[in-house]
Amino acid sequence: MENFLVNKHHNLFSNKQLSYKVYLCKDCSKKKKEYIHQETDHKPCNILNLGYIGITCNKYPIMLTTPIMVCPFGFNSQNQNLTLQFTNIKNDSEMKSFYDFIQGLELNQMQYLGLTEDTADLYLTQIRHDKEEKYDPNLLVKVPFIHKNNSYDVNIKHNDSSVAVTNIFKFSKLKCDIYIDNIWKFNDKYVCKWKVKNILIL
């Protein structure tokens, strides 16, 4: 079953140069947006008609395989999200390494955008901490949905069988192939979501 996943460790992307491509919105007043690639020396946070920013590593999209992670809340059909817990992060060096990688990637994006300590809250992190810090942090992951097909664009296996995303229940243990989405500007804030391609339910 391990062959079902791409089995790309996050260390493959550690300390590698990321490439960013800026796409501008041709007419922000239109409901159906069109975007054009634009080389620029300006900090993206200062571009008023910024549409999105593509991210690659060595010209390839960033897709990696997570460690085994607990999904505390199961699949959330309302927002099509999975919450993956960095379980036992204080004692598990592999989990801590994965957390540091995700956090480092977000910091790299913030620096590229041109955000400072004063404007850092304009970047919407996908790492979630509870306010009292009683629990391990979580990573928010999106399950892509194709509206024209009315279906989820994800492959899921459990015990050698394909299953639906609704089979991911509270506290399921998962290993996932996730990939990074573009940095989007939304309501004057910036968000870069992780999306899931393959899920192995353990």
Where do the protein language model's features map onto the residues?
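OB-fold ssDNA-binding interfaces and closely related basic DNA-contact patches used
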Residues: 1-147
